[in-house]
Regions:
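Bacterial N-terminal signal peptides that target proteins for export
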Residues: 1-12
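Bacterial N-terminal signal peptides
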Residues: 10-21
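Carbohydrate-active catalytic/glycan-binding domains of CAZyme proteins
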Residues: 24-542
Length: 542
């Protein structure tokens, strides 16, 4: 099998990529330079296009780089009819000045902002008001802050400053997750690991005239979902988010798994749900919605991790064009401070009778986002959207992140690249540490587009490492004994010129494959624990 290697400088290669551009609609769903974790997705009216709606993603912003989150909320949205085309709506909120316009902090940066929530309320005059619920994590006197706007994309202005202290807000002092029911009544949910009032979920009715205090006479319901420190299967950790589905109330939350659950160590890397006939409970545990570890059963019957070994994730459910998705975030790199927004499709079944069950399937970690038919093989894809990456030794999170095989690393660019958000110079995410015995995979490609075609080639942009190695290309699964089909192979040698190279791999056998299938690379080398290459991009060509 003859493999062609095309040499070139990084500048020339980027110029070539610019002719095609990195594909949209992959998972992560936003440009690969952007880091919006803790996403709360909502379908709201598009204020600039009457009669149209958009999906808005309200989340934190991982700009600190060496700590969770940042000092602004930056909003992204997509048209409901095409949820693959995300647009940066800019910074919608900062907590910088007090009620009198004076700086809140000596540094001038303002409050560090963690996971927010948002709601829309129809006011007495029939106009819609949008509320943002920031989490000023380091400013206890501003916990429970509420900001208001006439548009879903802001800007949002604080509406609950204290009448006596310009640096405080009027609230009952917790970080809030909120929900407005069809009848206009509003509810609030709170609970975080110790230090923020409660480590299980409490709930109460909210006063809609303030959106920051409890309704007079409201009863606080404690332990509506129990914590991981209590008995039971709920095992709530943090991040409550309420949704209503066919008359049932579904509470999504970050769950701390038990030791040995799923055959793995205890971690807080899953989203789960509980459901009820009432917004105030009682709630019944439903199951797992997503597990960042991408767990699967190996040929030996043991559970193995095929993605990150742990790390937090937050998110919620959203119906988009009649299909339900769980929005969550994944981890990149060797810390938890560059988290990327992801989606996974789920199936929802509701028994709408009193006490009826809500069944929601667990989503698979994949690379396709809203492209449910699979990625277009003829488009250019960043290698870092890989959803499957394993090494010869299982990855670990403690005492620090360590991978014996590939993993995606974050790419940062200064400022916002909103004007050319998907440009090849910024929309980049590479896969590093491709060692002997490791596997990288992308689920899924739409190989119906390549079926029956002759002369197919796979173009792989990479940087050679300092050891010789072989990369085998598989579809379906990464090994023959698992049902995989090997369709190509190429060598990477240490005497290749440095810098970016494009390897052209004949893959004639792919013509016999049809439908939505996974693509895998397996790596082998006589030298252990050394990277054969760093993967940048891949695409197919006739």
């Amino acid at each position: 099998m003859k493999v062609k290697v095309m040499h070139g400088t990084p500048f020339l290669l980027l110029a070539a990529l610019a002719a095609t551009g990195i594909a949209l609609a992959a998972n992560p769903i936003l440009p690969l330079w952007e880091y919006i974790p803790d996403g709360e997705p909502y379908v709201f009216d598009d204020p600039d296009n009457p009669g149209k709606k958009r999906v808005y993603l309200y989340g934190s912003h991982d700009t600190s780089r060496n700590a969770y989150c940042g000092y602004d909320y930056t909003l992204w949205s997509a048209p409901l009819e095409n949820p693959s085309r995300w647009r940066c709506d800019g910074v919608i909120f900062r907590s910088v000045n007090d009620a009198n316009g004076r700086p809140l902090t000596k540094s001038g940066k303002g409050d560090l902002l963690w996971d927010p929530d948002a709601q829309v309320v129809t006011e007495k005059d029939g106009k819609k008001a949008y509320y943002l619920f920031p989490f000023n994590v380091q400013a206890r006197q501003r916990l429970g802050m509420v900001a208001k706007s006439s548009r879903p994309d802001g800007p949002f202005t604080v509406c609950n400053w204290s009448k006596t202290d310009p640096q405080k807000v009027e609230s009952f002092g917790f970080h809030l997750a909120t929900f407005v029911d069809d009848d206009g009544r509003a509810y609030v949910y709170w609970g975080r690991d110790v230090g923020f009032g409660s480590d299980s979920v409490s709930a109460a009715e909210l006063d809609t005239s303030t959106m920051c205090t409890l309704k007079p006479g409201a009863e606080i319901r404690r332990n509506v979902v129990t914590s991981w420190r209590q008995k039971g299967e709920d095992r709530y950790f943090e991040g409550p988010s309420m949704r209503k589905i066919k008359g049932k109330y579904v509470l999504v939350y970050a769950r701390h798994t038990a030791e040995g659950e799923f055959g793995l160590a205890a971690e807080y890397c899953t989203l789960a749900y509980a459901y009820s006939d009432s917004p105030l409970g009682p709630f019944k545990y439903g199951g797992t919605l997503i597990d960042l570890r991408g767990r699967e059963k190996g040929p030996d019957g043991k559970t193995r991790i095929t993605a990150a070994p742990g790390g937090n994730t937050h998110g919620s459910l959203c119906e988009v064009n009649g299909r339900w998705y769980v929005f969550y975030h994944r981890q990149t790199g060797l810390n938890e401070f560059s988290r990327q927004a992801m989606v996974g499709r789920v199936n929802v079944t509701v028994d709408d009778r009193p006490g009826g069950k809500v069944s929601i399937s667990e989503a698979e970690i994949d690379s396709i986002g809203f492209e449910t038919e699979g990625l277009d093989p003829f488009e250019l894809h960043a290698a870092g959207i890989a959803c499957y990456y394993t090494g010869p030794v299982p990855a670990r999170r403690r005492p620090r992140y360590a991978y014996s095989g590939p993993y995606p690393v974050p790419f940062r660019c200064d400022g916002y690249a909103a004007k050319n958000a998907y440009g090849p110079d910024v929309n980049r995410c590479v896969l590093v540490n491709c060692t002997d015995g490791s596997v990288a995979g992308w689920k899924y490609f739409n190989f119906s587009k390549t079926a029956g075609k002759r002369g197919l080639k796979l173009l792989v942009e990479l940087e050679p490492g300092d050891v010789d190695g072989v990369v085998d290309v598989w579809v379906k699964r990464p090994a023959a004994n698992e049902g995989g089909l090997k369709v190509g192979s190429f060598r990477v040698t240490r005497d290749m010129p440095g810098g970016l190279q494009t390897v052209e791999v004949p893959i004639e056998a792919l013509a016999a494959v049809k439908g939505r299938e996974a693509l895998y690379f397996t790596f082998s080398s006589p030298v252990k624990n050394r990277s054969i290459c760093t993967l940048h991009t891949l695409r197919f060509r006739e």
